[in-house]
């Protein structure tokens, strides 16, 4: 094999193995550290847009509670196609990277649980 073919093969493999795009980076990859200045609020959802998306099938709001896999959550699936990360809720809670969704409820992108850290007095502190 000539040196030229070897070099082309090497750089070809290098190009294929080092690509990392926003939507498909591996955990711990080049873009795994999120710049918290770039995190935006997740899109509104639910009746009269009074809630916020916590996952592709979860919409929660203080006034309306939480919806799971209903027509109120359809808009949340749009988040999968947006290039920048988002965050709903203000106070972190739970053991799985969740945020307080409403009084007493902690949600991450997959599920919601009851959490005393999210009681009414401290939800937005």
Curated annotation (Swiss-Prot):
Localization per record: Secreted
Predominant location: secreted
Assigned keywords, A-Z: Amidation, Cleavage on pair of basic residues, Disulfide bond, Hormone, Secreted, Signal
Expression tissues: Mesotocin is produced by magnocellular preoptic neurons in the hypothalamus in amphibians, reptiles and birds.
Disulphide linkage map: 20-25, 42-86, 45-59, 53-76, 60-66, 93-106, 100-118, 107-112
Database matches in Pfam families: Hormone_4, Hormone_5
Signal peptide residues on this chain, from the entry's feature table: 1-19
GO cellular component: extracellular space; secretory granule
InterPro entries the UniProt entry points to: Neurhyp_horm (IPR000981), Neurhyp_horm_dom_sf (IPR036387), Neurohypophysial_hormone_CS (IPR022423)
SUPFAM superfamilies: Neurophysin II (SSF49606)
In-chain residues carrying the UniProt-annotated modification Glycine amide: 28
UniProt GO molecular function: neurohypophyseal hormone activity
Keyword NAD: no
Role according to the record: Mesotocin is a diuretic hormone.
Family: Belongs to the vasopressin/oxytocin family.
Name listed for the protein in its UniProt record: Mesotocin-neurophysin MT
Organism in which the protein naturally occurs: Bufo japonicus (Japanese common toad)
Lineage: Eukaryota, Metazoa, Chordata, Craniata, Vertebrata
